[in-house]
Amino acid sequence: LGTPIDQVTNLVIERVPGGAIIRATGLTAVQGVFQVQLTPATEDETPVNGVLTYRLEGIRPPSARAVGSTHTRTVVAARALTDQELSGVRTIRVEAARNAQTSRRR
């Protein structure tokens, strides 16, 4: 577990046989953030009122500086879910420090 990434810039839900892949792109406030992941907001990774929520998090290096272009501060994290895990889910939400993005299941 890390600290929240500054912003979520893109959220894609890709259907695959047997489930889906959640892919979130984010922009960090500093360069060098590593071990970026989608962390479930609930301990058992279950939806609340049909909404499955994740936090886009990463580990900041100790001597991080807010320098560099947005390209050098862009990170991506993904998480695979089965159809069973997606049952009862109407919306997937990914939160960052300053914003959140949602995607409705079709």
Regions found by a protein language model. Name each.
Residues 1-17:
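Transition segment at domain starts
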Residues 53-106:
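Helix-rich interaction surfaces within compact, conserved domain-sized segments
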Residues 6-9, 34-41, 74-76:
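N-terminal post-signal-peptidase region of extra-cytosolic proteins
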Residues 6, 29-34, 84-87:
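Short secondary-structure junctions
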Residues 14-65:
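Mature extracytoplasmic domains of secretory-pathway proteins
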Residues 1-3, 32-34, 45, 103-106:
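Gly-Asp-aromatic-enriched flexible segments
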